[in-house]
Structures are given as C-alpha cells and as structure tokens.
Amino acid sequence: MEILKHRLVDGGVQHLVCRKNSRKLSGPDMIVVHYTAGTSACTAAEFLAKEEVKASAHLVIGRQGELFQLVPFDTEAWHAGRSCYGGRANLNRYSIGIELDNLGRLQWREGHFVAECGVEVAPVDVYVDDTGELATFWHRYTERQKRLLREICRLLKQHYPIRYVVGPSDITDRKQDPGPELHGFMCK
C-alpha cells in the first residue's frame, strides 16, 4: 500500500465519491481516530459520502480489513466538529480523519452486552476497562483493524508532517471514542 496524489493505492482500498468536501488542507499534522458506532464499514462509508450528510472522513477501516477512502488527504473532511487541541480550534482544517468500524461503548443489559444501536455483542468481542471506579465495556477492535491503522498512520507520517494521533475524546468533551483499548496507540 502507498499514497499517490493524496490517495491510498493498492491494499484493496475502495474509493467512494464524496463531492461535498473541496476545501484544501495545508499540510495536515494530526490524525483523529474515530469509531463509527454503526454496524458495518460499508454502510458507514456510504452514509458519510452522501451529499446531505454534514459529516465525512478520509478513511473507514472495516473489521475484516476492508478499506474505504472518501476524501483525498489534501482535502478537509468533516469529522472533528467543534474541537480544539494544542491551542488550535476547528481541527478539521489540520487533520486526517480515520473511522474504525466499531460499535463503541456497550451496556450490560439482562445478561448481554448491547450497543447503543441495539446490536448484541458476544463476550469474546468485548474489551473491559476496569481502570476506573466502575468497569466499562467496549466493542473490541480486531487485530486486522489495529494492524491496518498502524500501517496507514506510518504511511501518513511519511507523507505529511503528522505530529499528533488523537481521538475525539482528546479534542472535545462531547465524545468518548475511540475508547480505552486504543489509549496506548493514541499516545504514540
């Protein structure tokens, strides 16, 4: 896999048309890693590419390693919303947004782990964060997703002056993604 003309090539990446994004980035120096909170990478990518949707991302990474690119890396995507980090606001202007297909935080209901959208998650796919006063439960990322995320971040750092890899929970108090499982990755 490589980056040519601000797009990923090879590696099975599927390029979707997302015409709503046209403002150019001037040297992105940040990667923001999100979770989709949805049921599939394809559904999330197709939704984010719709003209009427006021959100987008550069990439969506599926649980089995599927990869979608919606916006070139030199173009602003609408993923960070109202945000600030390192003394700067409006981070869409400085960042590349990567969405990981993941249901996010889970609830324990009647003996089952359930996502906000109502999908039940098998215990083997649950990440338990017991560092706080009460344990919290999260949809586990797949090894394929984590491996692909690392590879893509490495490529992006080779092509752009990336200084930060953060999650929405680092740039706004409205969000909790990508969750505690990726905390060690985000700090690197």
Please give the residue ranges for each predicted region.
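Peptidoglycan-targeting cell-wall enzymes and recognition modules
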Residues: 51-141
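Conserved, mostly hydrophobic/aromatic
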Residues: 33, 98, 168
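N-terminal catalytic cores of peptidoglycan-degrading enzymes
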Residues: 1-91
